[in-house]
Amino acid sequence: MTKANKIFKELDLFIYMLLLCYMLVDCMTGFLRIKGLPGVSQPYKMLLMLLMILSLKSYIGTVIYFFFFGIISINLIFYFFYSYTSFSDSLAMLLRIVMAPILFIYLKKQNEKEPKRFLNIIKFNTSVLFINLLLGLLGFGGSTYENESALGIKGFFYDGNALAATLFAIYVLWINLAPKNKVIISIVFLFFGFLIGTKVSVFSVLLYFILWCFFNVSKRKRFFVLFILILCISVLVYVLLQTPIFQYQIERIKWLLKLFKGNYVSVLLSGRNLDLNAHYEFYKTNFSIKEFLFGFGFLNFRKIIELDFFDTFFSYGLIFFLGIFGFYCYCLYINRKNKKITIFNLLYFALSITSGHIWFNSQVALFFSLANIIFLDRGKKINETHFASYKHVSFKIKSDLRYFCKTNL
């Protein structure tokens, strides 16, 4: 092994260690913010991005990285001179949205070299997620809805909406990876989705489970299975609607109907369509080729729309939007033969159009990327048993850490 190859191998090992701590760092950031201290998530992820870029020895990957960071640099130069743009927020959100393509490019390369590490990353981060939510159940951390009702649990994670999307992506990984007990896995994730208490955390898991079952049985039995599932889930939803958190959601819907004068679109989107109209009016008033191509950043006098699809276009312009949109279309294309992952990608895309903290969510980026990589066989043939041989793999954190310390300290 050459000296250069040894350095790259140790660098990949260090990145692997950082990825094992992915959710733990977000959890620490939430804890620090509750205490009024600055978080550690942003510098950690900036370091992770830099190391992944340095580690990648791929011409195509380098071109893609150059494209994203070239556009980001041009955007930031313009935003610096805009009086109506928050430069720091624009930079922070840019780094969040490019996390998914950077992770995807790096992990796709690692899938050819060290795919067994992926399962350890999923296991460890899932454990952190569950332990955190259980601690929230015991009264530690914050609530999903920080008001007088204090309903929902998010533990020490800072953003309930981002946490809901992350739970959904991790659920998709486990239901497709686990060799058995898929119904039990679904019940466990539904339980934790209920603890979080958002529409996304509960209904994304429910809807995916219904569609997963529908496509997992023979065509002859599909509609019978669908009927049974809808019947069981209707009973479950009825029970859920009697709980305080969903009673709160019902009262909130009634309040929104009154606020928006019976406009069901506004109620469904929690008024985000009105924010979309306001941003569109500002866009029309200040339109120029420069804003069309590079956007106007995150406005310092108006909150974001929280519809990621539209926020990306208005904030960062057509060129950057096409890059991000192209990435998600590529993920959909390469997994087109795998109906279960295609369903996930379509639901994920639908969430980005109807809600926020999906594309602009660096927390879920890792698990979205893994879901779109681990079921591929060289990008052509779907191999659904790709992880069957890994079910007995134990954690090698201790031996990996010993090797890293021995060679570097």
What are these regions (language model features)?
Residues 1-253, 284-290, 302-409:
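Hydrophobic transmembrane helix bundles of membrane-integrated enzymes that assemble
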Residues 246-266, 295:
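Flexible internal linker/loop segments at domain or repeat junctions
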Residues 262-303, 319-320:
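TM-adjacent membrane-interface loops and short helices in multi-pass inner/ER membrane proteins
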